[in-house]
Amino acid sequence: MLRLERKWDRRVEGWHSHVTSAAAFEQVLGRLIRLAAPEPTDTCVDLGAGTGFVTTALAPLVSSVMAVDISAAMTASLAGRAARDGLRNVSTSVCDLRKFDLAPASADLVVSSYALHHLPDPDKRALVARVARWLRPGGRLVIADMMFGRGGSGRDREILRQKVVALAAKGPGGWWRIAKNLTRYGLGVGTEHPATPEFWQSALRDAEFSDVVFRPVVAEAGLVYGMRPGI
């Protein structure tokens, strides 16, 4: 994982503007916040927080946010941004999400935006199971991510078609990315492992979350929500 950490450390410069300038960014962030329904008393965790675009949006609305990321450079950038914005209720943790853990019943809200597709499916399930232990009764998990499969559904095929069309429009550089991505897709290699909405809903239900729902946002972007029962 040191290699992955270094990869994200190298990408920190310009990453915040890269993410926030994406066409669907505002839609995904807005829908995530609304679905999470943050409360002023909530203790929150942002998994794969990057430079903090979700953390800093949540912080004014809750009691505290812990931002977790594998990259020390990303979390340092996040901490600096929070300090400049006067957000004193933000803390950071540099950790591989596959190893990160918290005390049972210590959080009210756990969120993640466009991070968990970097985990293989068994690690996604293991993380969801740990999150279920972290949450107090009534606590919520909200995941925003690319949510599609390998062409098994009409939605999958339309998402893949849109991606190919968008890349082809970029000219030779886009054609190269199409060839590279098709090779990785066919061989099942690379660092991105998007999962279907059905996978995510199954993972949450298997971890005994209740009220599990999927909400499409735009293109491949989707949200999955679940609540820890017991209120």
Model-flagged regions — what are they?
Residues 1-39, 42-48, 54:
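Conserved class I S-adenosyl-L-methionine
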Residues 51-99:
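Class I SAM-dependent methyltransferase SAM/SAH-binding core
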Residues 102-109:
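A short acidic, Gly/Pro-enriched loop at the edge of an enzyme's catalytic core
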Residues 109-122:
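A short SAM/SAH-binding and catalytic strip from SAM-dependent methyltransferases
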Residues 125-137:
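A short glycine-rich, Lys/Arg-flanked "PGG" loop and its adjoining helix->strand segment in the class I
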Residues 144-206, 213-214:
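C-terminal alpha-helical "lid/dimerization" subdomain adjacent to the S-adenosyl-L-methionine
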Residues 208-231:
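Core SAM-dependent methyltransferase catalytic element
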